[in-house]
Each structure stands twice: as structure tokens, then as C-alpha cells.
Amino acid sequence: MTERRRHAIDLDDFTATEIEEILETAESMREVLSREIKQVPALRGKTVVNMFFEESTRTRISFELAARALSANVVAFTARGSSVEKGESLVDTVRTLQALGADIIVMRHSRSGAPYLVARHFRGALINAGDGRHAHPTQALLDLYTMRSHHGQIRDLNVVIVGDILHSRVVRSNLWGLTRLGARVTLCGPPTLIGPSAFWTATWPTVRIAYDLDPLLAEADVVMALRLQKERMQHGLLPALREYTRIYGLTPERLARLPAHAIVMHPGPMNEGIEIFPEVATSATAVIEEQVTNGVAVRMALLYRMAG
């Protein structure tokens, strides 16, 4: 495995072919999870350390289940109660874990770019479970897997991502995956929550920017709603919540305008009644719980690949 492929920091680390291979492997892992005994010995003898410096439910538990289903030894690391609280640096912590025999580190960190620092000091494989506003590659992979399972392929899909684009690491990783696999992507939201369009089109030239959701619905194959990340916002970026919901919220009325084959997605956690209404989140069009379920198989596939 090349140095670049030794770690999974974002989907720009992978070619379109490699992404497709991960999705194909996830199909096999999904079959494993359908068995009475949901376990294979693929990572027996390997140690996976989950380092989460930021709160998580879906991603953390999903990675734990994925590693255990592959028969790995799983260690849950939290900053609280560790030497990090005594001032130990991130690099020294990683070196300690390496000395203790960690083969794979799964890391979530609030600081964008932190995985790149860790990767320079870890001889094993590093998987980014989300870093600041930068990237969340496994969320993008499970989103791609879910889209493909419903539509057969990613190429030529019309994908609308609506909400807090500016602060979303999910958007950035999805853009790498979706554009590499040939989807047509539109980012939609208030100008203050998208930022300069040139920021996006300079890296992803085929991406469209829109500020009005309603005209996009009739031709959408996928609509992905994003929560408002108020914890990352500066004052003044967000209009009144009621006004935001009126213009950008996925309401039952907007759901009715989607094509019959369209699916509604959300990476979670949801703010119901703001970016998505409960009636939409629980509708037959929504595949939100399916995304969560698919996350285990997709993360199994990536762990298996990174284990070499």
C-alpha cells in the first residue's frame, strides 16, 4: 500500500476505482452482518484504537461494531482521564499508542487538519472519523453506498445538498466522492452559509451553487439536508430560524414536489422542525436510518482495506 493510501484522511486520497472497490467490499460486509453470527476473522490479531476528541454517537459506535465484526481487538480512547489532560501532546499520545501495538487508529478531532499531523508520526493506518470543518470520509462513503443501493449507480445522479454548507465536513468529503463518480451536485443554502462560490468551484468545477431550494426539487434524485452547526458559526451568519426553515427546510410540502424515485438523506444529528420536519424524516422517501445501518458495513470495508 502506498504512503498516500496507508491513511484515509479524505476521499481525495482515493481514485474513483478505489472508491468503487470499497463500496463493493461493503456489499460483502453487509452480507456478513445479515448472518446469525455477525463476525468474520479478517482482522483477528489486529488492534484498532478509536480516538475521539469530539462527541460522537453514530460514528463512534459504528466503528466499534465494525471492528468487532472483523474480530479486531478494539480499544476506546477518550481524552478525559488520559495523559492528554495532563498536557501530553497529540503526537506523544499517538507514539504511545504505537508503542502499545496499535495497528489502526480511528480519530475524530475538533481541529481541522489534525489527522495529517498524526499520520506523519504513526506507522500504522489512520482513518479520519471527522476533523473540524475539513473532512468526514466514512460518512461520505456510507452516503455513496446508500445512494448506489437505491439508484444503481452514482453517475448522472442529481444530488442537492441543502443547509449549512460552509461549516460542513460532510459536504467536502461528499463532493470528492460524488464528483469522482460522476454525479451532478448542487449546493443550496443562504449566501452566508455557503460562502464565496469560487471557494467551491475552484476545487470542484462542476458543482453548482443555488440560493433557492424550490426550483431544484422537481429534478432531484437525492436531497441531503444538513443541520445548522451553530457551535461553529460566527454571530450574524444565520437568519431567524423560522425564516431559514421557511426557505430551506424539508417540509411535507417540499417532499411532495420530489420525483417518486427520489430519496431524502441526512448525516445526523437532526434538528427536527428546522432543516427537516419529522413527517419527512420518517417518510418512505427518507433513508436516514438506512444510512446509519449502512455505516457499519462501509466502515468494515474500509478497516479491512486499510489493514492491508
From Swiss-Prot:
GO BP annotations listed: 'de novo' pyrimidine nucleobase biosynthetic process; 'de novo' UMP biosynthetic process; amino acid metabolic process
EC number: 2.1.3.2
Highest taxon above the source species: Bacteria
InterPro entries: Asp/Orn_carbamoyltranf_P-bd, Asp/Orn_carbamoylTrfase, Asp/Orn_carbamoylTrfase_sf, Asp_carbamoyltransf, Asp_carbamoyltransf_Asp/Orn-bd
Residues binding carbamoyl phosphate, per UniProt: 58-59, 108, 136, 139, 268-269
Keyword Transferase on entry: yes
Keywords for this protein: Pyrimidine biosynthesis, Transferase
EC class name: transferase
The protein's annotated pathway: Pyrimidine metabolism; UMP biosynthesis via de novo pathway; (S)-dihydroorotate from bicarbonate: step 2/3
Record-level GO cellular component terms: cytosol
Pfam families in the cross-refs: OTCace, OTCace_N
Signal peptide: none
Reaction it catalyzes: carbamoyl phosphate + L-aspartate = N-carbamoyl-L-aspartate + phosphate + H(+)
Binding locations of L-aspartate: 86, 169, 227
UniProt GO MF annotations: amino acid binding; aspartate carbamoyltransferase activity
NCBIfam families xref list: asp_carb_tr, PRK00856.1
Similarity annotation: Belongs to the aspartate/ornithine carbamoyltransferase superfamily. ATCase family.
Assembly notes: Heterododecamer (2C3:3R2) of six catalytic PyrB chains organized as two trimers (C3), and six regulatory PyrI chains organized as three dimers (R2).
Role according to the record: Catalyzes the condensation of carbamoyl phosphate and aspartate to form carbamoyl aspartate and inorganic phosphate, the committed step in the de novo pyrimidine nucleotide biosynthesis pathway.
Identification of the protein by name: Aspartate carbamoyltransferase catalytic subunit
Native species: Chloroflexus aggregans (strain MD-66 / DSM 9485)
